[in-house]
């Protein structure tokens, strides 16, 4: 049966995902940045209360995936922490300035991760040649690759995702970016074995007083009065589609 991974940005979201049938959680902070390394407090809380597998993302900042030496050192330290806390896997990715997988740094990441399953995240979609990148990641021992097929969303990139799946069984190709209940069946019919979804909605802030002329974000258009939340019904609906597909 296909595996359903839900992207969660809080303890609350992780509990919702677990209750509604998620098979695994990618744990992140900062949804507006596309996901950054969670805080130690969140990591410890999730480790204590969530029983399904949780893979924290290791990403020190938003933007591109070429990191300074200092940023990369922090990533390795975060990986060691995630390993010490007992998580079964992690999510990360590093590129060279030419858009290739940085194999030298991936070797260090794999060594730091040890027995943890490593997912290479959508830095893969920023690679110059996805097929060369996949081969290199297979050689590195990466467990899976999260990809939208190098398109804005996975529905547009499905043909490339299918080509990547055809390259072999390892790493597992996990389709993500815009995967929802209304298009999930297309991925299952294409032979995708793992799917990744935010299954999220924006929850309005309960704040009554609002200073509408001020933003805490560098993006002055950012909505200060909403936050991301996993929608339990969306997770349950997707899990139901997967179960019914398996029963065919």
Swiss-Prot record:
<dbReference type="GO" id="GO:0005507">
    <property type="term" value="F:copper ion binding"/>
</dbReference>
<keyword id="KW-0963">Cytoplasm</keyword>
<comment type="subunit">
    <text>Homodimer.</text>
</comment>
<comment type="similarity">
    <text>Belongs to the CutC family.</text>
</comment>
<dbReference type="Pfam" id="PF03932">
    <property type="entry name" value="CutC"/>
</dbReference>
<dbReference type="InterPro" id="IPR005627">
    <property type="entry name" value="CutC-like"/>
</dbReference>
<dbReference type="InterPro" id="IPR036822">
    <property type="entry name" value="CutC-like_dom_sf"/>
</dbReference>
<protein>
    <recommendedName>
        <fullName>PF03932 family protein CutC</fullName>
    </recommendedName>
</protein>
<dbReference type="GO" id="GO:0005737">
    <property type="term" value="C:cytoplasm"/>
</dbReference>
């Amino acid at each position: 049966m296909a595996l359903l991974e839900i992207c969660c940005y809080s303890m609350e979201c992780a509990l919702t995902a677990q209750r509604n049938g998620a098979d695994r959680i990618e744990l992140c902070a900062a949804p507006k940045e596309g996901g950054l390394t969670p805080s130690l407090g969140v990591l410890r809380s999730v480790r204590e209360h969530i029983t399904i597998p949780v893979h924290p993302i290791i990403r020190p900042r938003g933007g591109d995936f070429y990191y300074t030496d200092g940023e990369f050192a922090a990533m390795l330290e975060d990986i060691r922490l995630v390993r010490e806390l007992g998580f079964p896997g992690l999510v990360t990715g590093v590129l060279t300035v030419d858009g290739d997988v940085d194999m030298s740094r991936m070797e260090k990441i794999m060594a730091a991760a040890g027995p943890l399953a490593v997912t290479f995240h959508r830095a893969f979609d920023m690679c110059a040649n996805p097929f060369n990148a996949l081969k290199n990641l297979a050689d590195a021992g990466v467990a899976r690759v999260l990809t939208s097929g190098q398109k804005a969303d996975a529905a547009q990139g499905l043909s490339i995702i299918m080509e990547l799946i055809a390259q072999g069984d390892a790493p597992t190709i996990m389709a993500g970016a815009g995967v929802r209940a209304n298009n999930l069946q297309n991925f299952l019919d294409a032979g995708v074995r793992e799917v990744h979804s935010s299954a999220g909605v924006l929850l309005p802030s309960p704040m009554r007083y609002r200073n509408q002329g001020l933003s805490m974000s560098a993006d002055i258009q950012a909505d200060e009065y909403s936050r991301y939340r996993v929608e339990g019904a969306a997770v349950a609906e997707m899990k139901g589609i997967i179960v019914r597909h398996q029963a065919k």
